[in-house]
Amino acid sequence: MRGFNKTTVVTQFILVGFSSLGELQLLLFVIFLLLYLTILVANVTIMAVIRFSWTLHTPMYGFLFILSFSESCYTFVIIPQLLVHLLSDTKTISFMACATQLFFFLGFACTNCLLIAVMGYDRYVAICHPLRYTLIINKRLGLELISLSGATGFFIALVATNLICDMRFCGPNRVNHYFCDMAPVIKLACTDTHVKELALFSLSILVIMVPFLLILISYGFIVNTILKIPSAEGKKAFVTCASHLTVVFVHYGCASIIYLRPKSKSASDKDQLVAVTYTVVTPLLNPLVYSLRNKEVKTALKRVLGMPVATKMS
């Protein structure tokens, strides 16, 4: 990653997100701390269950394992610093720390977007082509899709971070956010950023809209197949599908509000509330929706904890 432009005269940023709330910052600290611990416990539990349950050593649960790992890292990049700033009068962050946070935040965020699209395709094959599932989604393809998601996500993050680091910052240094995100940092640049903003907008479309459309296509076929199943199993699958789509719409919808709009309408106070949705809420919901509601995961969790597991009588 290149350093900031040599003409930069600002040596640090001040993150002013939530500063106007005064004494309510202590309450926010408690709320975010509890949410963060819940996210960590849920995701670490999922990773441990998948790791120590040989029955879950399949591509589908491999995707869930990596998503849980990525979600844990994703929140680790943002929330610990936010917790410190909520209790401190000093809310500064150096250029290098800001660039590092931006890079890893974008890297894990992009990886998550791509992984969820991969998981949508995995569900499409499992439900629409069950007899061919193991032939299509084998372990080799699973590893390739995971590697491709991570490599693509961090490559996009590297390009985006370098584009922002090349901008000139020579005046205001108050970032109207609780972490270093693209829009509020770009707003502080004192040179024309139109061309670079266009490039960043193109990257945002690539990592948000393309996976979102692929997910909609996958789940369109899934819903069509499920509706043809006239049983309780079909209704249960439909409810599961609906819960997945709800989280998808919340995640990609909020991300679109922030990243797919003109600069003139960016970096407002409302953005901080929207950002909480995809930096805290969806990482909290994903383990519940994709894993902890899954029967096989719950059964494996009981076995890991040494709890009795009900078995069907023949």
Swiss-Prot record:
Residues 48-55, 122-140, 219-237, 293-314 are cytoplasmic. PROSITE patterns: G_PROTEIN_RECEP_F1_1, G_PROTEIN_RECEP_F1_2. Glycans are attached at N5. Residues 1-26, 77-100, 162-198, 259-271 are extracellular. CDD domains: 7tmA_OR10A-like. Pfam families: 7tm_4. Disulfide bonds join C98-C190. InterPro entries: GPCR_Rhodpsn (IPR000276), GPCR_Rhodpsn_7TM (IPR017452), Olfact_rcpt (IPR000725). GO terms for cellular component: membrane; plasma membrane. Belongs to the G-protein coupled receptor 1 family. PANTHER family: OLFACTORY RECEPTOR. This is Olfactory receptor 10T2. It comes from Homo sapiens. The lineage of its organism: Eukaryota, Metazoa, Chordata, Craniata, Vertebrata. The gene is OR10T2.
